[in-house]
């Protein structure tokens, strides 16, 4: 399947829209915080591409993206409210509780079986798990034996886990990878800040081949 790692934000009228940043400055022809606009007000603006060129596209709602992608895309939800500087503990907890309400039976996301949650710690994963969330997988960082032991000791079965092993396969951590694979866990690297940034096309191709030869199960790329 195709994997999309997506970010979203709340509008002023509590509509969840796809938006990586908490502001619309970088990715649209508008300015300001997402939370300062209603969904309808945001439709005045158009998205720009990675080169800053204006496109005909508007900011989409999360539920429209979920409906479009069901049965063909696995969505990896990144909760930016967890690790963004300046976000209060109250807002962080509220965002976790919002996810839980949406994933529970009757919630807006409960009908979709193609959702994965990026979590930053075993404590965050356990918060979901202890609130009865069983209909998603968790993308968690396991880039050390300490990380592996923490999840091994948790009540979360390995079948709910995909392991993010950071920016590249590290030969010194082969034992960790072997333990993960023995549990049926897939490993994922992210090259968005490394190979993706190589400007020369030939050198970038070489960098990509190097990543493929390292044999992670999944490679995250922009």
Pin down the residues of each PLM region.
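Structural motif
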Residues: 1, 34, 107, 153-155, ...
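Short loop/turn motifs at secondary-structure junctions
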Residues: 1, 71, 111, 157-159, ...
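Aromatic/hydrophobic pocket-lining residues that form π-stacking "cages" and hydrophobic walls in ligand
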Residues: 2, 65, 176
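C-terminal active-site rim and adjoining tail of enzyme catalytic domains
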Residues: 139-222
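Active-site beta-loop-alpha junctions enriched in small/polar residues
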Residues: 9, 13, 21-22, 45, ...
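Metal-dependent phosphodiesterase/phospholipase catalytic core, i.e.
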Residues: 15, 20-126, 130-131, 135, ...
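Conserved beta-strand positions in the central sheet of alpha/beta enzyme cores
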Residues: 3-5, 18, 76-78, 162-164, ...
